[in-house]
From Swiss-Prot:
GO BP, one annotated term: symbiont-mediated suppression of host apoptosis
Record family assignment: Belongs to the adenoviridae E1B 19 kDa protein family.
Keywords: Early protein, Host-virus interaction, Inhibition of host apoptosis by viral BCL2-like protein, Modulation of host cell apoptosis by virus
Signal peptide bounds: none
UniProt cross-references to Pfam families, sorted A to Z: Adeno_E1B_19K
Protein name: E1B protein, small T-antigen
Species, as recorded: Canine adenovirus serotype 1 (strain CLL) (CAdV-1)
């Protein structure tokens, strides 16, 4: 299952994120895409880790309460790395976590929250997918004889392991 391929259509992506916010059970499995159930299960399993990343006292929740979403999502989305399925699923689960825990006293209506989260996230996913396709379509001759920028900047020790971020372990 390729999460980015499944999420190419905005309405499908939106439905998956919406479905993942429901409690586990027959309704979620029957009504929504199978990916919504997978993402929802990840959220339930990893909720403690998400709370470590964004505790209840974090400024993000105050911004959401006041209806400010552009700045937080700009910060979240610019650092987004989607090079493997684990990170893709973790990102979708994080979006679901944000929606599940959005402050109930927010000035943003429940219906608008979904689009405030999904629109910028889906746009970023599309940009990431297009860039990955372009890089994959480049002929091998472009890369011959060139050292890796990552190797030069980061050193070998960073190439052998995954991200230090607890969300993406």
């Amino acid at each position: 299952m390729d999460p980015l391929k499944i999420c190419e259509n905005y309405l499908t992506f939106r439905s998956i994120i919406k479905g993942s916010t429901f409690s586990p059970g027959v309704f979620r499995r029957w009504r929504f895409h199978a990916l919504a159930d997978v993402v929802g299960n990840i959220v339930e399993r990893e909720e403690g880790r998400f709370w470590e990343i964004v505790p209840e006292t974090h400024t993000l929740w105050a911004l959401f309460r006041g209806g400010f979403t552009v700045a937080p999502f700009t910060e979240i989305l610019t650092s987004l790395q989607l090079e493997n399925r684990g990170r893709q699923l973790a990102f979708l689960a994080f979006l679901s976590f944000l929606l599940r825990n959005w402050p109930s006293d927010s000035v943003v209506s429940e219906d608008a929250r979904l689009d405030l989260v999904c629109a910028p996230a889906w746009s970023r996913i599309q940009i990431w997918s297009q860039a990955a396709r372009l890089i994959n379509d480049l002929p091998e001759s472009v890369f011959e004889g060139q050292g890796s920028v990552v190797e030069e900047e980061c050193g070998e020790e960073h190439l052998a392991r995954d991200s230090d971020d607890p969300l993406f372990d």
